[in-house]
């Protein structure tokens, strides 16, 4: 079993440490996987498309610009991720249906909750580098999450 603290000790100069104040909403507190990215503004159509097409074990990283206008993820989309065996979802934005999310067996990080839904226009970008939390999130790199933090590596560290 790995811990972010141990990975930081062992690979100190090879990691990025995210400094975004995320809250955990999913059932899993610890998760890791290959990164896939989506950048959106108050629109979760590309989030849904990503969840429906990404391979098992992936972590979808959603940059919603920390917008407080709406939630980008709720129980329906999280259930798709669970059904498809994704490792987790990290949202630089907000979620809703938090009481249901805690029973969904994936990792879910977000800034907080917002009760209203997003627009459905399909605007945004996929598979691009994102920057938030003082780190760069690149597709096909690896993210490790537990109760102590979020770290990113350009290679798999999990043994």
Curated annotation (Swiss-Prot):
Pfam families tied to this protein: RraA-like
GO molecular function: 4-hydroxy-4-methyl-2-oxoglutarate aldolase activity; metal ion binding; oxaloacetate decarboxylase activity; ribonuclease inhibitor activity
Highest taxon above the source species: Bacteria
Cofactor: a divalent metal cation
Gene3D superfamilies per record: Ribonuclease E inhibitor RraA/RraA-like
Residues that, per the record, bind a divalent metal cation: 97
Family of this protein: Belongs to the class II aldolase/RraA-like family.
Known function: Catalyzes the aldol cleavage of 4-hydroxy-4-methyl-2-oxoglutarate (HMG) into 2 molecules of pyruvate. Also contains a secondary oxaloacetate (OAA) decarboxylase activity due to the common pyruvate enolate transition state formed following C-C bond cleavage in the retro-aldol and decarboxylation reactions.
NCBIfam families: NOT-MenG (TIGR01935), PRK09372.1 (NF006875)
Name of the molecule in the record: Putative 4-hydroxy-4-methyl-2-oxoglutarate aldolase
Organism of this sequence: Bacillus anthracis
Lineage: Bacteria, Bacillati, Bacillota, Bacilli, Bacillales
């Amino acid at each position: 079993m790995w811990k972010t603290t141990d990975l930081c000790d062992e690979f100190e100069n090879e990691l990025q440490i995210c400094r975004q104040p995320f809250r955990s909403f999913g059932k899993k507190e610890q998760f890791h996987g290959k990164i896939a990215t989506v950048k959106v503004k108050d629109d979760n159509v590309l989030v849904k498309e990503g969840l429906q097409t990404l391979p098992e074990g992936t972590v979808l990283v959603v940059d919603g610009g920390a917008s407080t206008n709406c939630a980008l993820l709720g129980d329906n989309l999280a259930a798709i991720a669970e059904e498809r065996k994704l490792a987790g979802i990290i949202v630089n934005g907000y979620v809703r249906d938090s009481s249901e999310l805690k029973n969904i067996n994936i990792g879910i990080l977000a800034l907080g909750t917002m009760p209203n839904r997003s627009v459905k226009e399909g605007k945004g970008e996929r598979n691009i580098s994102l920057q938030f939390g003082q780190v760069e999130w690149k597709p096909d790199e690896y993210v490790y999450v537990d109760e102590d933090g979020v770290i990113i590596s350009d290679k798999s560290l999990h043994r």
